[in-house]
Amino acid sequence: MKRIGNSSKSFYPGILKEYIIDSIFKSRYGSKVIYDDLDNLSMYIKGFCINSFNINMVFKEIFRHYENISFDVTEIKRIFHNKYAKEYLIKVNTVYKGAKWIIPIKLIGVADNFPVGIKDSVYLSRFKLEKDIMLVTQEEKLAYTFYKIMKGIMFNNNLLLELYKINGNLKDKKNVSKAIENLYNSNKDSLVIRNIKDRIEQIRRNINYRSNWKYFTYRENIKIKYDDVMCVLDMIYVLLKGGVVNE
């Protein structure tokens, strides 16, 4: 069970997150939302074509369930866009107990057939409720994270950490390469093994990346070395080449 609480990257009261998530469940989009990252309010909305024009409409419907608190979408930034998925970073402004707060929400619109996942349980402490949600399949999450790292989309330490954690949760990796291939194909992108290898080597040898990771893990008290993450990238590279990985 996941508990919704404040993240080190979230600079607003945790109760506002609970208000938003509870509103989503009460709205007509409740059955379509799939949470990718509860701590940082990253979510998929499946079977619904989102764009910069109708995002306001979606959140207006969601936020109407809390009339005593005003949530206003003030900024919509497109991060990633193709026929497979559309990813936006949304900034929501609200006033709570006399203070103004900005809540970043990452919203990804995907087709009906993605993602297909398993059920999990979310506990909303404020409302004493348990809700069933769906999670993206681990192979698809790993593929999507790997793709963003290879393409330099939002490349940062959190993305590398996410890759490492997802890989650690995978018991069977036989479908990883297929998921990555499907992602590239759906984006009409060429999966060039040589380019993958070069990109991994670039990440491995980049002194700034390594130094930033060391500071990041020290600050967050994370016992994962940079070379551990590189091993995950190497494993994926071998899988894409069609090799066999001994674990």
Which residue stretches match the model-derived regions?
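Structured mid-to-C-terminal alpha-helical surface segments
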Residues: 2-33, 41, 48, 52-247
